[in-house]
């Protein structure tokens, strides 16, 4: 906590309730991340520019994990994404496309990442839209969840009235975030660690020995998917932590 004094740390007591409280007390924009997300490029525009994107366009989300470079749906099978056939390039900054035409059914995103607007992997939303999705307090209780993946899944399972939802997704020209699934935490059944896997125990030991991931030494030169294993590199830091 001392290392990042500008962050507002919240001790988890009840993941479901904590998430709801943070959403409702937050600013006009909401973004979710999980622990294996890496922001590997700087966001070069200000909050005002992003807010104008939402205010002036029928935009559901700004995806930090998508871009013209993210053409692979599954790096383990090398399945390719279904890329939108039409779209806009706005202010030489944002790609915009119709996510509904990418979907065979809005509750079952069969066509992949470009038809999947509600993600906890670095998607930015207007807060009032997220509040609409989770519903009132009674609705929110009904979609009980204990993890980020469960939160995402329950929102999709709840079903939406597409006619009242924003029809567009957006991203920057190239992705800024990649999910590097090097191991699994919790009950997720997603594949991970097939190329550069590192166990939780190994990571913890590195931390205790005074090492941090060195993003400057990691290779982000060929990001082709939202989920892509990146080999970890470490650097020794001055203020060594120990048990």
Segments (PLM) and residue ranges:
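Short, flexible, basic/aromatic active-site loop/helix in glycosyltransferases
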Residues: 81-113
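Acidic donor-binding segment of Leloir-type glycosyltransferases
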Residues: 1-11
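Active-site nucleotide-sugar/metal-binding loop of Leloir-type enzymes
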Residues: 19-30
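A short, glycine-/small-residue-rich helix N-cap motif at loop->alpha-helix starts
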Residues: 9-21, 40-41
């Amino acid at each position: 906590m001392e290392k990042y004094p500008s962050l507002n740390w919240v001790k988890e007591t009840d993941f479901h309730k904590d998430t709801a409280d943070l959403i409702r007390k937050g600013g006009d924009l909401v973004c979710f991340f999980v622990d294996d997300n890496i922001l590997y490029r700087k966001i070069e525009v200000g909050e005002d520019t992003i807010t104008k994107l939402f205010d002036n366009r029928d935009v559901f989300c700004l995806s930090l994990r998508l871009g013209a470079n993210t053409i692979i749906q599954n790096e383990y099978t090398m399945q390719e994404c279904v890329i939108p056939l039409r779209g806009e390039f706005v202010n030489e900054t944002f790609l915009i496309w119709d996510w509904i035409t990418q979907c065979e059914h809005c509750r079952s995103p069969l066509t992949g990442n470009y038809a999947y607007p509600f993600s906890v992997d670095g998607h930015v939303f207007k807060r009032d839209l997220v509040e609409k999705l989770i519903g009132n307090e009674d609705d929110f209780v009904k979609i009980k969840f204990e993890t980020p993946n469960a939160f995402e899944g329950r929102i999709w399972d709840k079903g939406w009235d597409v006619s009242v939802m924003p029809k567009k997704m957006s991203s920057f020209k190239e992705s800024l975030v990649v999910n590097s699934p090097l191991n699994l935490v919790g009950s997720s059944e997603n594949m991970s660690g097939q190329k550069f896997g590192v166990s939780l125990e190994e990571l913890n030991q590195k931390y205790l020995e005074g090492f941090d991931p060195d993003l400057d030494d990691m290779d982000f030169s060929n990001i082709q998917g939202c989920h892509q294993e990146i080999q970890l590199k470490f650097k020794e830091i001055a203020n060594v932590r120990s048990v």
